[in-house]
Amino acid sequence: MDRDQQLIAFCQQAVQIPSPSGQEREVAQLMKRKMEEYGFDEVLIDRYGSVLGRMRGNRPGKTILLDGHIDHVDVIDAGEWSHDPFGGEIDQGRIYGRGTSDMKGSVTAMISAVAHFAEDTGRDFAGEICVSC
């Protein structure tokens, strides 16, 4: 599977997990698992359910933080949707579902981008890149 397909599948997995505010545990576990699979140096879920992953470069330097959220507005009108709010279906090149644009799509892209940057550079960068959600 190429990187684009991996990211699409990751986003679909995230969208398929309902995570209204205060109920993010399952999607947080997915983010943690993916960060670990991608080789993040440290991954933790804090007592509030937020996920933090660190990818360290080979040289000392500053830290950059990419931050997003993995909860979403509750679905109260599922019958009004043209696609299943938790289906993660692709239709005409678009992924449909609650959280695709706000903001599970962005979080999955950030995690993937950090992992691929580290891989492509052989971690030859200064500092560390953190992703939190």
Per-segment meaning from a language model:
Residues 1-65, 69-76:
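N-terminal helical capping/dimerization or prosegment-like subdomains
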Residues 62-130:
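Active-site metal-coordination/substrate-binding segment of hydrolases
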